[in-house]
Every structure is written in structure tokens, then in C-alpha cells.
Amino acid sequence: ILGTLPFLATGKPIPAITDSLGNRIYNLNAITIISNPKWDSKLFEFPGSISYLNTGNLDEMNIRSVKDISTIVPNLFIPDYGSKLISSAYIRGIGSRINSPAVGLYVNNVPYLDKSTFDFDFIDIASIEVLKGPQGTLYGRNTMAGLVNIKTLSPLEKQGSKIKLSFGNYNLWGVAATTSQKLTDDFAFSINARYRQDDGYFKNEYTRQNSGSTRSGGGRVQLDWRVNRHWKLSFSGDYEGSDQQGYPYAGYDKTLKKTGSISYNDEASYRRDIFTSGLSTQYLHDRFIFTSTTG
């Protein structure tokens, strides 16, 4: 037996404030405007599926890396294979484990073409946009499944200094420090540094020590210069080095359907050093915007 249940949907009016002149003032919710060299539009007018995170979202949910995004963004999956060198991303089930990635990553309009660079620690992130579905028409290679677009905070827009400390079990601790200052009204810089370590979450029965430890650290410099009302220049350079022990693998017994203990005496490690830089030049005209990015 099929039936229907009628329901009534009602809208809640927006409260108005009347000023001294009798004018009615309405306070509306903020509208997020997406702006990059590819397109400019209101977030809800973007012709596709997109997830947007701002600085407040990242701090509230303790998002500290690209892998952490997949815990809250629907249809995005970034498995943790143990090493930062292996960071495969999947959107709607489409991705690549071995070859060129099917999900693109851009940081300040600079493409990260190799997925071995995807896993890095966040600091001073302004926003993250996850575009789902093919983006090759605008972004070209490595975007068959979608795109992750990351923007960092501009020192021209926000100044100050802060230090962030984190602690946990298994000797997990980290520190991050950043400062953003204006030298003039039109020139500003930001400098940050970060370090994080842990001793691993598994024990090697052979050595009687923890296995899978991680040590990573790096820094970032950004210079923003508003030359005049038409021209704007932005330069950024970022370095991150990471040193990880070999991932703690163990044998699997098909008969007992049980994973064995971790026990080996072979020394193994992963070492990764990444340096990225980018220079963005922007010309603002009354009728158009010209942007050139070199990275």
C-alpha cells in the first residue's frame, strides 16, 4: 500500500531593524565569492559540486593536512598508506594509486603535479575548495576526477603573530609559529615555521621499539606588494622535509584469518624534501583581470 503524507513548508522571515529615519535594515548572511584566474562567481552559482572550507572551519575541526580534508568532505577519499611519499586521492571513486594523479592540487594557483607532494602540513590557510567532477577544460592535466584548490592568507589582509602547540600520546608533539606584518600600507610579508613528530603507533617485536616514527618540519615565506591600484605582485616559497621509518608491515595468515606480529630487523626509511615557489602577477582593469602565475 502506497500513500502520501502531506506537509507544510514555511519560511522564517528575516527580522528587520528600523533606524532613526524610519528606514528598514535587513541583516543578511554573508555570501562567499569564489575568485581565481579561472572564474569569478558566487559560491551557490558555481555550475558543479563544490565543498568550501574557510580558516574558521579548519581551526574548529583541527584540519592540519590534505589527508584530513577527506574526513569531512563528501566523496573525497585520501587513504593513509603510511608514507608521505604515497598520497593517492580519489573523488567519487576515481583516482590513481601508481601513475599520474586523477585529482589535481593547486596552492595559490600553482599546480602540484606529482602526488608525492600532496601530503604536507597546513599553516596560514585562508580557504580550501574541493571541486568534484572533471575540471580538465579549465585546469588541464591530472583533474579528471576533480580538484583541490588551496589559498593561503595574504599578509596584506591579516597581520599578527601566533604560536600553536600540540601534544599527544606516543610522544606526539608539534609546534607552529607564524607572523604577518606590514612594512607599508601596500607591502607586507609573512613568515612561518613548523615541526611535528611522533614515535609511531606500533611496536616492532624484534627490536622491542616503536615502529613507524615520523619527523617533519618546514617553513614558508610570502611577500605581497600592491604596486598601485592596477598591479599586484605576490611571491611565496615553501620548504618541508620529512623523515619516516619504514611502515610497520605484518604478515597475514589466511588459515587463521589473523594478522601476525610486526617483527623485522631490516632498517627502512622514507626521506622527502620539497621546495616550492610561485610568483603571481595580477593586473586589475575596470573591465577585466589579467593574472600570470609562475611556479
Question: What name fits each language-model region?
Answer:
Residues 66-69, 88-93, 106, 130, ...:
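N-terminal periplasmic accessory domains that precede
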Residues 130-131, 159-162, 202-207, 258-265:
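Extracytoplasmic loops and strand-loop junctions of Gram-negative outer membrane beta-barrel proteins
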Residues 118, 201-209, 246-253:
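Outer-membrane beta-barrel translocator domains and adjoining extracellular loop/strand segments
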Residues 25-59, 87-88:
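N-terminal periplasmic "start-of-domain" segments of outer-membrane beta-barrel proteins
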Residues 160, 167-198, 206-244, 275:
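Transmembrane beta-barrel wall of Gram-negative outer-membrane proteins
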Residues 232, 236-275:
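Flexible loop and strand-edge segments within Gram-negative outer membrane beta-barrel domains
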Residues 108-134:
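Short acidic/polar hinge/loop motifs at secondary-structure boundaries
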Residues 67-110:
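Extracytoplasmic beta-strand/coil segments of soluble accessory domains associated
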